[in-house]
């Protein structure tokens, strides 16, 4: 795989100013060692504050010395998105801990911890994908555990399988938390 440098990405003429600023922020923070990986995306904040975001960019475009409004907006975005990400991470940890106690009762398998870890690594999955990740457990046991979790309502079918295409499943609660949506299990 060929990786473009940060500078190459940001010089790409097909990217809008908006796209460049969305990419530049986490890449810059990563380059300064403030992020382990450049995965702190501000797009969600920018979308929810779209008008102010566009106003700040337009003001900067019209007056290249008008950095203060943009910087204040950007710092507020970092602060609020960081708080939201921390809230979501805490909710994910809480869900994981609760499922650690529920999975053994539902699956009746000592290997359920491996399945839980694999599901948290890939909340949308197929049985073949999960079976390929958990080498310590035979495929029939993995399928039985997944079916038990489906019957219990923990997992949900996302797409039906057809022909050679496997059905996909999801841990809906984890997907909802990742989107910032509430789950019935707990308020966070």
Segments predicted by a language model, with ranges:
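Short acidic, hydrophobic short linear motifs in intrinsically disordered regions
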Residues: 116, 121-134
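Phosphate/pyrophosphate-binding active-site loops
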Residues: 1-89
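Short amphipathic alpha-helical interaction segments
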Residues: 136-148
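Hydrophobic, well-ordered secondary-structure elements that form the walls
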Residues: 74, 130, 142, 168-169
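Short, cationic-aromatic polyanion-contact patches
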Residues: 109, 157-186
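Short conserved micro-motifs at the rims of enzyme active sites and ligand-binding pockets
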Residues: 85-86, 128, 180-182
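Short alpha-helical segments that sit at the start of domains
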Residues: 87-116
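Glycine-centered, phosphate/nucleic-acid-interacting loop/turn motifs that mediate DNA/RNA or nucleotide
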Residues: 153
